[in-house]
A protein has these predicted regions:
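Catalytic core of pol beta-like nucleotidyltransferases
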Residues: 1-23, 29-35, 44-89
Length: 89
């Protein structure tokens, strides 16, 4: 599970970059153990801003970030959408 501080940082940057929504998934949402990284799915960010968004999250969050662009259709992205937890949007 991620900290409230990390969640607030994610929400702050989601607003800054005007994303449609953010989904946490993987170890980021499991309560039984501490996550080694923060798994984030994002939809609605402009492609030219994706890596800037990623860099800011990587800089300010307490753990490494895995960022997935959910605007691309794939089985993995469908799984993230079905099993993850939406925290904004």
């Amino acid at each position: 599970m991620i900290t409230e501080k990390d969640k607030n940082i994610i929400l702050q940057f989601a607003k800054k970059y005007n994303v449609s929504y953010i989904i946490l998934f993987g170890s980021s949402i499991r309560k039984e153990r501490e996550a080694n990284d923060i798994d984030i799915g994002v939809k609605g960010i402009e492609p030219r801003l994706f890596f800037k968004f990623y860099a800011e999250l990587f800089k300010y969050l307490s753990k490494p970030v895995d960022l997935v662009d959910l605007s691309k259709k794939s089985l993995f992205n469908e799984l993230v959408e079905e099993t993850g937890i939406r925290i904004c949007g």
